[in-house]
Every structure is written in C-alpha cells, then in structure tokens.
Amino acid sequence: VGFKAGVKDYKLTYYTPDYETKDTDILAAFRVTPQPGVPPEEAGAAVAAESSTGTWTTVWTDGVTSLDRYKGRCYHIEPVAGEESQFIAYVAYPLDLFEEGSVTNMFTSIVGNVFGFKALRALRLEDLRIPTAYSKTFQGPPHGIQVERDKLNKYGRPLLGCTIKPKLGLSAKNYGRAVYECLRGGLDFTKDDENVNSQPFMRWRDRFLFCAEALYKAQAETGEIKGHYLNATAGTCEEMMKRAIFARELGVPIVMHDYLTGGFTANTSLAHYCRDNGLLLHIHRAMHAVIDRQKNHGMHFRVLAKALRLSGGDHIHAGTVVGKLEGERDITLGFVDLLRDDYFEKDRSRGIYFTQDWVSLPGVLPVASGGIHVWHMPALTEIFGDDSVLQFGGGTLGHPWGNAPGAVANRVALEACVQARNEGRDLAREGNEIIREAAKWSPELAAACEVWKEIKFEFPAMDTL
C-alpha cells in the first residue's frame, strides 16, 4: 500500500481513550476552549498532536517513524464545571520525546507552537506530572531546605527578608547602608529588587562590594548569619556567571536570578554553579503573571513552580494570600506544598491534577512577598509554616522611625507569633491580640502597628479554581 496523502482528523490518530498511562509518561492537563463547531475530542487530539509528533497533513516520513512509540495521546477529556465550552484534556507524552535535564526542551514541546493553534480559542496548561525517570535527569535545587537551615543555623521559624526600596535610583553606598540597617535590626536576608541588574546609577560590582560590607558588619554585631540576595541576572549567560563568581569570591552565602526573564537554560547553568560552589540561589518570578494570570490561556504558576524545582532554585516567590499580589489560599498552598514536599497526592480542591513523587529532589522555600506588613504576620506564620521566607519591603523600610526599627518590628512580630503558635494558641483567631500584646513591650512594633492598621489590598482573585 502506497503512502496516502491528504488531511485527516487528528482524533483518528491522537485521541485514545483506552490508553493506559505509563509510569514514565509525562502527563499534562490542558484547559481547552475550542472554536465553535470543533468537537472536544478533535480539539484534545489536536493539542496532543501539535505538541508532539503531528502536523496538519499526512507526511511521507510518517511511514519511517514509529508513531505508536513517539506520539502524544489525548487519553481523557472532562468538562469544566460551570463553563459551557471548556474542558480539561489529559495528554500523555512518551519520555523519549524530551531531552534529559532540559526544562527548555520540555517546554518547547509541551507549550510551544500549540498555543497559537487556530482551532482553539484558548489553551491553558493547568498541571504536569513529571515522572521519576525524567526528574532524576535533573540536579534540581542547588541545596534545598535542610541544607539552607544548616548553613544559616536558623531553625524552628520562617526566615525574614526585605527588598530594598526604592527599587531603582539609589547609589551603591546608600543601598549598602539600607542593607546594613535592615540586617542589623534583625532580618535574616535583604534582597536586590528583580530589576536591579547593573544600571548607570549603580553598577553591579559596586553594589556587590557595599552589600558584602554591610552584611559582614551586621553579622559581626548580631552574631547571626546574614544574607543579601545579590542579583546576578544579566544580558548574557557569561556576564551572569561573572557576577555569580564575584559573589562567591566575596564569600557571601546567596545570589539571585530572575528565572523567567533570564530563561531556563541560564537558570539551570547558574543552579549547577551554585551547587558546585556552595551558594544558595534565590529565584524571582518576574514576568510570571504575563503567562499565568489569565484563567483561560497560558500556563498555571504551579507548572512554572515545578519547572523551577527541576531547573534549580532554593527560594521562589509564591504569592502571599494576604498582600497586594494575586494568590488564592487553597491554590497557593497547593503549589507551595508542591515546592517543599517530597511526595504530593492529587487534590483537585487545591488545583493539583496529578500525584507527584519528587523522589528526594531537594525542596524549595516559598517566599511570600508583596504588600505585607506586621498585621499580616500571624496569618503568614499560620499559612506558610516554618519552611518559608517572609519578605517585607515597604513593610520594613516604610517604618516611621527608619529601616532598623522597621526590621526590629518585623522580627519581634515574628518571634511573638512563633512563640504563641508553639504554646498552642490559634493564630487565625487571636492574631491581632498576639501582635498587640507584643507591641506593649516593643515600641518599634507599636509604631508599625499604628502606621499600617488600616491598609488592605482587597480585590477578588482573577484565577479561581
């Protein structure tokens, strides 16, 4: 029988409802909104085809390929509750389609061309199941949660951070001064803002030197190990590595990278360097909302979070649930646990579509940051637990008495919440009272409580289940 040219329906080849998924398959859950008149099976099959071996017409070289071995398969379709023309298409990809240890290649296939596909009005990748066989080809986070605690000698509480503001325009010397004041006041970390790279007002080398000086001075005075996330993100990979190497030569404990704008290839290289050289790696997710904010199109942040755990990072920003940026409680907690835990059961109420076994890939500390202040401390301590970093930028530097008292207020509030929790008190119910009690013996905290007593960022979340 000769080669049969022509166009045939995707569903004839790529829709296989009786397929049993393998332990080695990468599984994806897509939220599909087809164009009017396109049946769900055809749309789901089209997604499977276009993100694996298919093209729009039958080609001669199909005959010299083992399609059964390499094609993606749409194996299940379910309607989305409350949405008329939307459904979840589950697609299984054979492991052989992906290069080992490359998040870049995985995303190029799964979320590459298919998102521009005309037969679909919109497409969103809701979740991925990474099989053990694939996750074992990645190094993952440079160090992980336990190693970080051991390096910093800090146990039994969340870590405290602060992003130095104004984010742009400070000179290196003044920037270092702000870093020193915050660390001296009781914070564990300070942070470069994500867009501080190496601009005319502050070149990277000057910033690194002044921040290192600030950090060593604060360390000597407090007897605690301190860190400042030195942002190594740069225009080229070579320049990024140069900055990371300089940070290591200064002896600082941690560097930082913007993993979405910097790219997964650069991020994975940096993560490998960090593990080899004992640097912790803080990851900022600038640009994530471009990809994950729309409910119908793009990619959910939980997928970006899984990708980061593979690519490598010790901290990642994960929303606050209570501050100024997007994040619903159950959904946020779903991907927070997914970042920290070794094994995670499927749980649709938290947006988790697949059971994920990370087989001892190190965990990532979630970072809560964005519009939070001392009144949020009980809620944050309860929601995120000990394994997290709570970052107060304006909530430290906006203190009426200055940066160091702002840091003191946050540290006192945190220690009060941790102590109350350990005594068995209910942080959700008694939170305000716990903060008020602590403020009685901390004038710095009392002043902070007064400034921010009315501030709220109450808008409904865009991305609901």
Curated annotation (Swiss-Prot):
Q: Which GO terms describe its cellular component?
A: chloroplast
The compartments listed are:
Plastid, Chloroplast
Q: Which domain of life is it from?
A: Eukaryota
Q: Which cofactor(s) are needed, names only?
A: Mg(2+)
Instruction: Enumerate the catalysed reactions.
Output: 2 (2R)-3-phosphoglycerate + 2 H(+) = D-ribulose 1,5-bisphosphate + CO2 + H2O; D-ribulose 1,5-bisphosphate + O2 = 2-phosphoglycolate + (2R)-3-phosphoglycerate + 2 H(+)
Per the entry, what this protein does is: RuBisCO catalyzes two reactions: the carboxylation of D-ribulose 1,5-bisphosphate, the primary event in carbon dioxide fixation, as well as the oxidative fragmentation of the pentose substrate in the photorespiration process. Both reactions occur simultaneously and in competition at the same active site.
Cite the NCBIfam families for this sequence.
PRK04208.1
Subunit relationships: Heterohexadecamer of 8 large chains and 8 small chains; disulfide-linked. The disulfide link is formed within the large subunit homodimers.
Similarity field: Belongs to the RuBisCO large chain family. Type I subfamily.
Miscellaneous comment? The basic functional RuBisCO is composed of a large chain homodimer in a 'head-to-tail' conformation. In form I RuBisCO this homodimer is arranged in a barrel-like tetramer with the small subunits forming a tetrameric 'cap' on each end of the 'barrel'.
What is the protein name given in its UniProt record? Ribulose bisphosphate carboxylase large chain
> Which organism's genome codes for this protein?
Casuarina equisetifolia
The record's gene field reads rbcL
